[in-house]
């Protein structure tokens, strides 16, 4: 599991805020260093609403803290999320919320892309990023990663202009960072993937063990 100290949240947030965000023009060239956003230039961020997968009135809520650059997160999405969806989400027993964690600028770029198509497409884009993580992260340069992310966006039906607008939206970037910082601090997140199941913090674990926790929460609802 990819671990980070709680104190890292503040440091990571500061670093992300001043990092150069990719313009990702059609040539897939990131914005030059001189165009980097500074903390003073960034607007005040606000906490964005959660994007729910499943029925809003499902009795049990599962929150996952995940990073798009975390291999264990990708493994959960490839192996266990389909089981969770089939057995609990699609049957109305559980609603699922993914909250993005940003370890680095690349993870932030991917997080912006996931939100770029709107809330209705968030989980579809997230699935593309997680299932294709080894492919789009397998790059020698940031230019290559930029190009790979653009391919993911195009596969999700986004235009180059749409992606550029999202990556250059200072307010959205500030909001995503504020959302990450607020939730991760409140839930004392120490690594990814981490889960909060009806208020109980749960670490990444085999499916059979997670299933026991979910079933116990459902039984407690009566």
Task: Please place each PLM-identified region on the residue numbering.
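C-terminal cap of thioredoxin/glutaredoxin-like
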Residues: 2-7, 24-34, 67, 151-222
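Residue-level signal for pocket-adjacent positions within structured domains
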Residues: 46-48, 131, 197
